Amino acid sequence: MSKTYLITLTPIDKFFFGGEITFTRDFKNKDKESRALSDEEKDLRKFDEEFSSYVVRSNLFPQQTSLLGMLRFLLLSNSGEKIFKNNKIQDADGAKGLIGEKSFQIEPNDFGEMDFGKIKNLSPCFLRRKTTGDWENIFYAPFDKDLNVKFEKGNILLDVGKSQVPDISYKEPKNGSEVTFNQKDGIESLYFGNNSILKEKDIFLEDTRIGIDRNFEGKTQDGAFYKQISYRLTNKRKISKDKYEDHKLQFALKVEVDDDCTLPQKSIVSIGGDNSQFSLESKHIENTKPDELFPVITGELFCSGKVVLISDAFIDEVDLSNCMFAINDTVPFRFLKSDLTTQDYYKFSGKSKLLRSEKKFLYTRGSVFYFETEEQITAFEKALKAKSRLYQIGYNYYKTIKQ
């Protein structure tokens, strides 16, 4: 038996959700005598060369693996000192029953579900918005929102060598005339609910920090300049030239846990690369199908059906072979690995350290895949669900729209 909670996360201040790019580190010998770099320092330097910069920008949403880590830590920190004390596990067996033996990991060709103890599954993270009435669920809009994607005879994707782009157009807002879409113009990032359409700037406000690192003697270090772009959630949006609408925003997700597991109603939790703090509230709710949270999608459909990603998704290339056409984007995916022996969650060197996963790429939420037949849609849905380990923590969620 299990039960479902709605968890809301309200930022206490600005937040920073770490991405693929991190700040550089200085590996120069601090001693006067030079020495060779250790193997661990060489590995970190290699990582810096590929993924470091003096300018870093937060992701807009927390990674699902970070939310899972937050929940696992929340259960541990509320388990009592016999199991968890001074941020260290005291009883490995007790901890295993609560949170499982390992954090999220992907093994080669193994996408079966993992054991996370009392935690059964997570939904994708989404936004909730409130003006004067009830809270409204807000999701990233499909990339083809307000676009007409028309497949005419002879314009269907048969294979990669014979592929043709369908006719894509949109209605001009001012006069309603149909205009051919030019991909050079790009696609605006939109968010929508059943009653709202929001631009990115209506939700997220940049908070930029620029500085120079200095050593303990007050001297500027080499490569010390940095620029960090964090975000805040807005408290209003502009609806006309001189008119604003007040609103409240928060992150949210559904979590299914064992029936004997009780989440705290309120807590302060940390998420992200800078341990950004959030006010967590949990509420017991009735379980619903994943796509029932997603707003209704309207508009004409010029093929048998399409699949819209509600969350980022891991999709094998072979599973895209029957797709007529797609409007999509990808994002790097990397996560931190730990187990019950991990003692230091802030270092990547030494004993009992955190480990970085290999980099993979996910198709981003909002991506749209078009199909000619219902059989092709069913096969694609099956492929998404087959990655049950990812689905378990909020990836590979989708909404299917058919004629």
Which role fits each region the language model picked out?
Residues 1-403:
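Conserved active-site/ligand-binding neighborhood in enzyme cores
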